[in-house]
């Protein structure tokens, strides 16, 4: 591959649409290769803004604003990092010859739970939980009765667990409706899912490039209110279940096409593997790879996009704990004990300009056998404070 100098007319440019903590790590990996980075988000001083060559704060759901910026910057690759983006702008950008990663149609299918569920279950005939889509409270009540209780209720468009809830009985339906409607994102339509009494859930990081499809070690995770609080790698699972997960992940990512990393989520019950969701980009649970792999999910994503060789050397088991702010602040300060930083552990601070209760501000990372790594990652998170 030929590497040009950044800030020159012939520079290789990556535009990040979404500049949170995941985008920040992608930007850092691109910078290590001398790639020019343009970071875009809806607010100033987002994490990836701090490590980019140029940054912008725009309404990413405004088609005209997105296209105007793309034409101005002329990126070699456009990397959507969040769901709240004008999909029509991405389709138009492709028509104009710009390269969207993995492609605009894949982003369209995966940014919307309805699109990806219908694609997986009905087009690809993959095993999923039962589901219905509703747009009214009466429709939600009826769907709950048909699906059965408990059931999981989510907006078709939201991220990081926003708007998700479990209705244990019919009496919970109105509360779930209100939770969904108060979430950020588009809550005009909801998905009602059968609750699968799973043994565990995993993320299978799946990487596509010109040479084929490769998988990282499976990642186990625990979620609270739909957002991860702890992840670890590897997740111990039977060879049969892992093979099924890999086959499903390959089928769905082959169906989407393009290159880069995909975070494919599954529920596992006994030996049954249920497809859940998919993100066509690095996954929050995959931050554990910052300490467990020779090339993190972010490095793999950038290298796959550029067509560079990939390395999947696994250093050893590890865990990642999410620290969420306890306070509101326009100038957040994190207090982290020194013993969080050792030869086998560290904390990544995202540098977000504001905090609010429940906002993810940092992660702890520990390299150790799984049980001890999970304990230590959780312990470190519990010792952090903010003000």
UniProtKB/Swiss-Prot annotation:
Classification via InterPro entries: ATP-grasp (IPR011761), ATP-grasp_carboxylate-amine (IPR003135), ATP_grasp_subdomain_1 (IPR013815), PreATP-grasp_dom_sf (IPR016185), PurT (IPR005862), PurT/PurK_preATP-grasp (IPR054350), PurT_C (IPR048740), Rudment_hybrid_motif (IPR011054)
Catalytic activity: N(1)-(5-phospho-beta-D-ribosyl)glycinamide + formate + ATP = N(2)-formyl-N(1)-(5-phospho-beta-D-ribosyl)glycinamide + ADP + phosphate + H(+)
Assembly with partners or alone: Homodimer.
Any one GO BP annotation for this protein: 'de novo' IMP biosynthetic process
Superkingdom of origin organism: Bacteria
Top enzyme class: ligase
Keyword Acyltransferase: no
Its job: Involved in the de novo purine biosynthesis. Catalyzes the transfer of formate to 5-phospho-ribosyl-glycinamide (GAR), producing 5-phospho-ribosyl-N-formylglycinamide (FGAR). Formate is provided by PurU via hydrolysis of 10-formyl-tetrahydrofolate.
Metabolic or biological pathway, per its Swiss-Prot or TrEMBL entry: Purine metabolism; IMP biosynthesis via de novo pathway; N(2)-formyl-N(1)-(5-phospho-D-ribosyl)glycinamide from N(1)-(5-phospho-D-ribosyl)glycinamide (formate route): step 1/1
UniProt name for this protein: Formate-dependent phosphoribosylglycinamide formyltransferase
EC id: 6.3.1.21
Binding sites annotated in the UniProt record for N(1)-(5-phospho-beta-D-ribosyl)glycinamide: 21-22, 81, 284, 352, 359-360
GO molecular function terms listed in the Swiss-Prot or TrEMBL record: ATP binding; magnesium ion binding; phosphoribosylglycinamide formyltransferase 2 activity; phosphoribosylglycinamide formyltransferase activity
ATP-grasp domain mapped to chain residues: 118-306
Protein family according to the UniProt entry: Belongs to the PurK/PurT family.
Keyword Ligase: yes
